[in-house]
């Protein structure tokens, strides 16, 4: 028997080794074929004569900037023939970040990168030079920094008593696990208009688990968010399921994403001759009559920079498009209508218009194939939350947080006060976090999901609070003395708050037809790229979504045959599945 068992094990080992060798051979063949296609495509693009063809990109966020980079790098399109229109005076869209030592610093959002699942992001930025490390790409710079500053949260969840919870267990009951498994196995099309709460209506315990609090605040889900998007997150981020309690999969950047990624990308585009028209809003599109989808003209509204009232400060213009020109539009923005407050001032009560969504709505009203923006931008009470960026003199504030969490700046990922009325979370990055940040100042960032609720200590809704009040609420959840809080508040330069009414709009429940295709059916020269277009299997609210959409738009309109980096199917890899199952059983 022992001899037979030995022979069986030997045969199994040989078969396994043969399988590994075969897989390597197949991978090598795939890479060789991909390299051959790239070489052919490059030769074709090098021989193209674009003449006077122009590319007009609407919106100055990551999607448009990535599209411009792909046009230049992969299509050999002249940078001087590319124009990016941005309605504000800052590029980067939702990836903004800036300020100064006098007024403090601010990031409206804080976007998570992940080494395993940002395939096109890393590929694009591998060709964008770093601004601070000559000879290195942005991708190399970020990943080198991240590997030197690993994340391992020691205080992922904190209860109402200020106790750091043991989150090694996900806290599931059997019914929770069955509902999760059933969701993963359900066809996405059957989840039209369903919320997460709808799906787990028979197991409300799910919303009390450690897993829910951690997954919710990592990705900014609400109970009323789309069940389909929640399902996508589970599939796309299954690699992270097994380590969600430590956030080891979070990829840290040397500075905020604006300074670490947007500024180098902007410099790359400027060096290539791309035109940026800031403070210039595209108010409408003119489509050619008849079948198909062809943009004929863009209607522009430029701020003339003069101190004038109303329409007197704007110049209206029309940009006619010729045969061969292309237009790529940012369809909706998560930070549309964002409002800022500061240490002593709450954000304004008056809502601002959703500029990007308005343009999308006008286009969709004429062409039904352009999706349904109303589905995403009509319920601010469901899609709004607030962030706050704290700037302090010295490191006393950060030391107090470090003493509580056990994490030095840059190592803790996200900390969530799970029982707080506003569901407050914060992250303390490695310092400095802004390019212009002085050595004697420190910053950290936080956000609250339940902004209409009355605070636990400050008895008013977060939406109505000043930066000072929000920080006081936060510090009291650390359960430190009033005397120490007073000392810490003396070091504060500013707390810039940001109300974002549409930030969770991509997670709104919707039908599978509500998001348009990147290049709509019948389009001759028009594409859309944003968090609101349809990218099968991809997860919204990520940098990868914007870059993948941009690459899809450019390659389709320009006839590029080089494959786009696919969504890596971690949810089909046995090792990843087993690790996730093991975590789910804890």
Locations of the language-model features?
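Extreme N-terminal leader/targeting segments of oxidoreductases
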Residues: 2-55, 73-80, 579-586
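Glycine-rich FAD pyrophosphate-binding loop
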Residues: 72-99
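Conserved FAD-binding subdomain of flavin-dependent enzymes
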Residues: 103-143
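Glycine-rich Rossmann-fold phosphate-binding loop(s) that bind the pyrophosphate
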Residues: 59-62
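Active-site-proximal substrate-binding core of FAD-dependent oxidoreductases
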Residues: 556-586
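Rossmann-like flavin
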Residues: 131-236, 251
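C-terminal segments that line or cap access tunnels to active or ligand-binding sites in enzymes
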Residues: 239-251, 324-548, 555-566
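Helical element adjacent to the flavin cofactor pocket in flavoenzyme catalytic cores
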Residues: 235-326, 331, 357
């Amino acid at each position: 028997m022992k001899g037979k068992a030995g022979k069986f094990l030997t045969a199994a080992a040989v078969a396994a080794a043969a399988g590994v060798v075969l897989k390597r051979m197949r991978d090598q063949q795939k890479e060789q074929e991909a390299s051959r296609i790239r070489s052919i495509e490059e030769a074709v693009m090098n021989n193209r004569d674009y003449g006077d063809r122009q590319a007009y990109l609407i919106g100055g966020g990551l999607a448009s900037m990535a599209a411009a980079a792909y046009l230049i790098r992969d299509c050999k399109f002249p940078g001087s023939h590319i124009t990016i229109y941005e309605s504000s005076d800052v590029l980067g869209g939702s990836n903004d970040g800036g300020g100064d030592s006098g007024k403090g610093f601010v990031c409206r959002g804080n976007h998570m990168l992940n080494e395993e699942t940002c395939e096109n992001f890393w590929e694009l930025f591998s060709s964008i030079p770093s601004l601070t490390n000559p000879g290195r790409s942005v991708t190399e710079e970020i990943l080198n920094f991240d590997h030197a500053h690993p994340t391992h949260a020691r205080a992922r969840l904190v209860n109402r008593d200020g106790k750091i919870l043991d989150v090694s267990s996900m806290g599931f009951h059997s019914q929770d696990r069955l509902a999760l498994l059933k969701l993963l196995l359900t066809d996405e099309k059957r989840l039209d208009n369903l919320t997460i709460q709808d799906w787990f209506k028979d197991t409300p315990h799910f919303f009390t688990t450690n897993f829910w609090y951690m997954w919710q605040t990592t990705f900014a889900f609400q109970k009323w968010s789309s069940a389909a998007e929640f399902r996508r997150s589970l599939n796309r981020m299954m690699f992270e399921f097994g380590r969600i309690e430590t956030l080891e999969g979070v990829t840290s950047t040397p500075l905020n994403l604006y300074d670490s990624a947007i500024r180098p990308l902007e410099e790359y585009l400027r060096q290539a001759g791309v035109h940026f028209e800031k403070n210039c809003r595209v108010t409408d599109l003119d489509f050619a009559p008849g079948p198909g989808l062809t943009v004929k003209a863009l209607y522009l509204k430029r701020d003339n920079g003069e101190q004038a009232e109303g329409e007197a400060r704007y110049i209206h213009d029309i940009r006619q498009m010729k045969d061969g020109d292309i237009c790529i539009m940012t369809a909706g923005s998560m930070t549309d209508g964002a409002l800022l407050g500061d240490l002593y001032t709450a954000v304004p009560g008056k809502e601002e218009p959703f500029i990007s969504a308005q343009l999308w709505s006008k286009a969709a009203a004429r062409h039904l194939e352009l999706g349904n923006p109303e589905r995403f931008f009509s319920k601010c009470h469901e899609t709004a939350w607030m962030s706050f960026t704290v700037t302090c003199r010295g490191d006393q504030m950060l030391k107090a947080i470090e003493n509580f969490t056990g994490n030095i700046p840059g190592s803790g990922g996200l900390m969530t006060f799970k029982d707080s009325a506003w569901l407050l979370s914060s992250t303390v990055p490695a310092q400095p976090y802004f390019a212009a940040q002085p050595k004697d100042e420190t910053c950290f960032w936080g956000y609250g999901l339940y902004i209409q609720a009355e605070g636990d200590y400050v008895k008013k809704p977060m939406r109505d609070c000043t930066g000072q009040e929000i920080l006081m609420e936060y510090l009291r959840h650390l359960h430190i003395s009033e005397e120490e809080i007073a000392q810490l508040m003396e070091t504060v330069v500013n707390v810039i708050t940001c109300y974002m009414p549409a930030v969770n709009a991509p997670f709104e429940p919707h039908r599978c037809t509500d998001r348009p295709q990147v290049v709509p059916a019948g389009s001759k020269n028009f594409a859309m790229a944003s968090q609101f277009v349809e990218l099968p299997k991809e997860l919204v609210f990520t940098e990868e979504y914007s870059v993948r959409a941009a690459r899809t738009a450019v390659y389709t309109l320009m006839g590029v045959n080089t494959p786009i980096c696919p969504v890596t199917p971690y949810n089909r890899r046995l090792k990843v599945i087993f690790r996730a199952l093991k975590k789910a059983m804890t």
